[in-house]
Amino acid sequence: MTNSGTASGVRVRIAPSPTGEPHVGTAYIALFNYLFAKKHGGEFILRIEDTDATRSTPEFETKVLDALKWCGLEWKEGPDIGGPYGPYRQSDRKPMYQPYAQELLDKGHAFRCFCTPARLEQMRETQRAAGKPPKYDGLCLNLTAEEVTARMAAGETTVIRMKIPAEGSCDFTDGVYGDVSIPWDSVDMQVLIKADGMPTYHMANVIDDHLMKITHVARGEEWLASVPKHILLYRYFGWEQPVFMHLSLMRNADKSKLSKRKNPTSISYYSALGYIPEALMNFLGLFFMQIAEGEELLTMEELSEKFDPDNLSKAGAIFDIQKLDWLNGRWIREKLSEEEFRARVLTWAMENDRLMAGLRLSQTRISKLGELPDLASFLLKSDLGLQPSDFAKIKSPPEEILEILNTVQPDLEKILEWNVETIEAELRAVADRLGKKLKVVVAPLFVAVSGSSRSLPLFDSMALLGRSVVRQRLKLAAQAVAALVGSK
């Protein structure tokens, strides 16, 4: 599975987008690439793909870097340390892409499209109504050079799309899926350069992988259908394509796609609750090898030795939190000395922002230190153990409580900047929309978030816990209240 055609040897990359909380799926793909590089004596690099200017933020980029460092992953090159093929942030590489786009236009491999968003949406609606998968219909494909020049001179908004063969299929070999054949008539005329001049993922990742001498592209299976577009771009430019490997997605125990709405998915969630990073990497690494029962406890070095990229399963990797808890417990008991354990606890506590902030909030609410555990322990618990009876003391009827919880959950997802002010504003908006007093809305939230009707201030608590933990607790609270409703 190695590509000996490159003089520099094996080079792989992880290329996350800084558009949200760092996902365990990112750690999963990053670990595979990291182990692959170590297995072949190659280099592992990190690149930030921030072509989505509306959702990418420096704050999320920092969180991504911090999360991957917490996982114990080290990269040879990246936006934080530089390297010979930088910049390693796509927004900083914007001027590099335009000449390649012009080359495709000059060679007749791409064309300018002037279709408006409204026209494209109408096109997709028509296609969906006819039972066809939405894709560009080629309206601008055959515009003459004179027409293009005139429309650009008139100030019309334009994007650049790639041309796709009209017939035949794209046949390639994937490192996991083997031989794959995808008909060209199912492939969209992908936008390569957006109206703002930024490249799309498809354009940028091909150019960057080539310029950074990436030999193997290992990513999630959701990108398998996009390989024809990428192979075509390599052909258009006359470049050697890398080896593609598409890893099965992580799934919940019921085989559904791992989703933040079902289970916590952010790396920060597991870090804040005291999971050991070595245990999380151990857990994820087991997806890439066959291990006998009783031999599951592996260090990063041992994972590297046993890593077997030639025998990967196409079945979804099951993210079993119970197994992670079991493995994390074994790491704490069997791998850490007493001194290491004490050091880990102290480091975790001192670096735990929610705990430190919780102590500050608690200081004005207790008369003796012994009251602190009852008041603030909810900040550290992974599971509050909520029962239907915990909500029975609230004055509102169970049906109303359930309505509040089910309404609040999706509304909180709309918050871009998660802080005390935005949380309060959103909950006040929910109360207004439901026609209820704010205290009626927050009463069940106190119990859902802290496990008690007496706790630290709600908005502060929610801000401290973070979006992932709050999401999980509201989901479990809704399940408990639903049981209360069903028992009536």
Curated annotation (Swiss-Prot):
Primary location: cytoplasm
Pfam families in alphabetical order: Anticodon_2, tRNA-synt_1c
The keyword ATP-binding belongs to this UniProt entry's keyword annotation: yes
Chain location of the short sequence motif 'HIGH' region per the record: 16-26
InterPro entries: aa-tRNA-synth_I_cd-bd, aa-tRNA-synth_I_codon-bd_sub2, aa-tRNA-synth_I_CS, aa_tRNA-synth_I_cd-bd_sf, Glu-tRNA-ligase_bac/mito, Glu/Gln-tRNA-synth, Glu/Gln-tRNA-synth_Ib_cat-dom, GluQ/Sye
Binding-site residues for ATP, renumbered to this chain: 260
Gene3D superfamilies assigned: 1.10.10.350, HUPs
Entries under NCBIfam families matching the protein: gltX_bact
Family affiliation: Belongs to the class-I aminoacyl-tRNA synthetase family. Glutamate--tRNA ligase type 1 subfamily.
Protein name as annotated: Glutamate--tRNA ligase
Organism classification: Bacteria, Pseudomonadati, Pseudomonadota, Alphaproteobacteria, Hyphomicrobiales
